[in-house]
Curated annotation (Swiss-Prot):
Gene assigned in the entry: WDR48
Location in the cell: Nucleus; Cytoplasm; Lysosome; Late endosome
Family that this chain belongs to: Belongs to the WD repeat WDR48 family.
UniProt name for this protein: WD repeat-containing protein 48
PROSITE patterns xrefs: WD_REPEATS_1 (PS00678), WD_REPEATS_2 (PS50082), WD_REPEATS_REGION (PS50294)
GO biological process: DNA damage response; double-strand break repair via homologous recombination; embryonic organ development; homeostasis of number of cells; multicellular organism growth; positive regulation of double-strand break repair via homologous recombination; positive regulation of epithelial cell proliferation; positive regulation of receptor signaling pathway via JAK-STAT
Species: Gallus gallus (Chicken)
Role this protein plays: Regulator of deubiquitinating complexes, which acts as a strong activator of USP1, USP12 and USP46. Enhances the USP1-mediated deubiquitination of FANCD2; USP1 being almost inactive by itself. Activates deubiquitination by increasing the catalytic turnover without increasing the affinity of deubiquitinating enzymes for the substrate. Also activates deubiquitinating activity of complexes containing USP12. Docks at the distal end of the USP12 fingers domain and induces a cascade of structural changes leading to the activation of the enzyme.
Superkingdom of the source species: Eukaryota
Amino acid sequence: MAAHHRQNTAGRRKVQVSYVIRDEVEKYNRNGVNALQLDPALNRLFTAGRDSIIRIWSVNQHKQDPYIASMEHHTDWVNDIVLCCNGKTLISASSDTTVKVWNAHKGFCMSTLRTHKDYVKALAYAKDKELVASAGLDRQIFLWDVNTLTALTASNNTVTTSSLSGNKDSIYSLAMNQMGTVIVSGSTEKVLRVWDPRTCAKLMKLKGHTDNVKALLLNRDGTQCLSGSSDGTIRLWSLGQQRCIATYRVHDEGVWALQVNEAFTHVYSGGRDRKIYCTDLRNPDIRVLICEEKAPVLKMELDRSADPPPAIWVATTKSSVNKWTLKGIHNFRASGDYDNDCTNPIPPLCTQPDQVIKGGASIIQCHILNDKRHILTKDTNNNVAYWDVLKACKVEDLGKVDFEEEIKKRFKMVYVPNWFSVDLKTGMLTITLDESDCFAAWVSAKDAGFSSPDGSDPKLNLGGLLLQALLEYWPRTHINPMDEEENEINHAVNGEQENRVQKGNGYFQVPPHTPVIFGEAGGRTLFRLLCRDSGGETESMLLNETVPQWVIDITVDKNMPKFNKIPFYLQPHSSSGAKTLKKDRLSASDMLQVRKVMEHVYEKIINLDNESQTTSSSNNEKAGEQEKEEDIAVLAEEKIELLCQDQVLDPNMDLRTVKHFIWKSGGDLTLHYRQKST
């Protein structure tokens, strides 16, 4: 397969555009942390976040701010990471279906592997062979030679991979011994499947667990395997005997994370019950409750700078990562104060972590306001914030206020069609635009708070404007294709290039650091870049291959979509005593204000009726010709009422708002008119 290889199939697949509203530098994990890797040589900890970001931290306790850098290229949860090549290279697996290869020291992505067709959930690493395996929900296991991956370049971008077949269900855990002779997978099939990665031959299938196998470890020579399952048990397997040789019932709920010491004599376990235990594999009755976290445990990483390990790092569904000391654990065992009596449990060895890498808040709730432009959010700290989807920014932090009250406070009797969707999976606002409804929302410039240079009040398409802002730096959007030939002539004659089409949309810009993502509707990412980087040569070329035609139409060809039309019927109200008209079906822009319909009634229906009943003098005709539009508007409001469902309508309402809030029925909208009683 080819790293960075993207087939030019944008015309055949359904491509969506997404962007993330966020700060330029996101220093803190904004969601749970799925994986950890420790580099003891450089005193660095790598965290793989559900916010899609891999962060590097200093574990030097004397450093006031532990944050070093962020590694950003994924677009969904990062599920697993492994450090290779003595800490020089990091491999990551993500729910965006990719495996990425990083320069761990400099923090940049070197290549992207796209062989998986679904979430990549687990990685395994054979240190002696520099071999990495990846697996996920597509039931596939791929083997990668790390030295080959790190040698990839723009011209040499092809890498071969071996695959292990035979899994019948989604894979959630993977392990490979250091020597690279055995690989084991765990899945929702509730069995362990074992292969020889050198030949890709299936060796065995081990049965015993009754639920998903979430964690796996192998000893150095690949003769023993530890497994943790959602069934709440830890099992020790002999691969030589092809059977389970011990079962440890330590936890009250599912076991999601395991670590083991070098000698493979003590297992550290954590999971849904938030407790972390150390269990003696030779004597299962000897187990020590090390600590209790505040959230379910997702991953652990032993500090192996000494033997026995002096500490363990723990990641949970919360955004902070804790380091717990293990220094007193041996005295604890020697004294006999271990937890072998469930009816009279011993308190944990540690009540406070030794070190905390503080996390940030995650957005857990949102409400799109009626104007379909602003969003209210609530985070894990109960703070409420107000956001502008169009400008891709936070407008205001409202603090710890009542979320529902804020929604009520900002309610407006206005209807704008849905034109985007919101996802909170990463703990940040991800906005997605889809061809099916992206151009559904038209508003007037005045209502949107924008002024036009000529003082007019044009109708603006929100989705169209936003796409133009997101791709403002892409050179292809700067020159209308019709003017390219003429522009080249100007360039040749005058020595300068003339931009005939302004950059962006002329009304607003989005923050240049905004991540823009092109992906298939099923969730598979095609290309991610920062808004400001679309002017780069490589990025521009990839945009040419990736941007779908429906986006090209708006951003490059400047073809704005047509207005939405709404059909309706106009009839005299029953109280007016007027004869019911022939039921003609009318049609108008759904943004047409009620006052314009009132003017139509006054001018075309009421005036015509009056003229047919009286003989008009030439003076009256002359006066009628001089009557201004403004006068008609004033007279219409003075003399005419428009009703829907017997409710008098506000002249400032538009037809779509009337249909949504007042008509509320199937079929075409019906409006009634009557003259106001004098």
